């Protein structure tokens, strides 16, 4: 598996982070997991921190057990080992971050950024664009340059109102020097209503529908074609 020349390095592993909580990381992650699975790929999900709800969403979307990566509760060696062990037979490994990218228990210690650097994987930044347009440029620029050891490989915008809105956001990415990988349109059906979701049969059916809709959105506005940087070659299918 490889993404040579894609801007994501030689490994089809990356972390999905965000500037803040409630940016749409989980919705995008679920959609991407299912979209890649629907393409016949083995996708291994992970979650930063001890969260057990998001890992359940990941499993529903990917068909594989999602694994917690936590540098507060476990050693760096343990985190590296389980990341490698669970992803050994996968075509792509996707780590969903927690809170804002640099938010940890002591500055950025224990943060999603720390885990991305520990595993030496790039970050896809999800930005909530609900009430903003070109002003995302300095935000993206800041995330790109705040820590030179961390690679921000691209941006996906969430809560985009229209193609015209996306045009402003795409220009902001270009001026900040970070690739724009796509967007998800504003859609109330793509909002996870509560942390209880998925704990009952009825709620699981609702979650499955949300995953299906998110995957459709990701396929149409992020992946778009088989050669997209987020999609590694399918074994034997080139």
Please place each PLM-identified region on the residue numbering:
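Intrinsic disorder/low-complexity segments
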Residues: 1-10, 227-238
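Short conserved micro-motifs on helix faces and helix-strand junctions that flank
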Residues: 21-23, 176, 230-233
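Short, electropositive, low-hydrophobicity segments enriched in small/polar residues
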Residues: 28, 67, 101-104, 186, ...
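Short hydrophobic alpha-helical runs that function as membrane-insertion/retention elements
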Residues: 123-126, 181-183
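Internal gly/pro-rich beta-alpha loop/helix module
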Residues: 134-227
């Amino acid at each position: 598996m490889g993404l040579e020349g894609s801007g994501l390095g030689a490994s089809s592993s990356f972390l999905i982070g965000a500037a803040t909580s409630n940016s749409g990381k989980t919705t995008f992650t679920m959609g991407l997991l299912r979209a890649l699975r629907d393409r016949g790929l083995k996708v291994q999900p992970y979650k930063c921190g001890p969260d057990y709800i998001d890992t359940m969403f990941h499993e529903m979307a990917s068909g594989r057990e999602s694994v917690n990566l936590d540098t507060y509760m476990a050693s760096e060696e343990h985190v590296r080992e389980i990341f490698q062990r669970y992803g050994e037979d996968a075509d792509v490994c996707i780590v969903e971050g927690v809170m804002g990218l640099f938010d940890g228990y002591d500055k950025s210690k224990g943060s999603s950024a720390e885990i991305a650097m520990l595993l030496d994987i790039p970050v896809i930044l999800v930005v909530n664009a609900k009430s903003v347009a070109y002003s995302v440029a300095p935000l993206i620029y800041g995330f790109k340059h705040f820590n030179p050891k961390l690679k921000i490989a691209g941006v996906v915008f969430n809560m985009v109102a229209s193609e015209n809105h996306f045009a402003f956001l795409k220009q902001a990415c270009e001026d900040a020097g970070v690739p724009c990988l796509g967007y998800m349109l504003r859609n109330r059906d793509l909002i996870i209503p509560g942390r209880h979701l998925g704990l009952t049969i009825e709620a699981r059916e609702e979650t499955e529908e949300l995953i299906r809709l998110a995957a459709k959105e990701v396929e149409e506005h992020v992946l778009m074609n088989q050669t997209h940087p987020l999609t590694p070659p399918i074994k034997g299918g080139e």
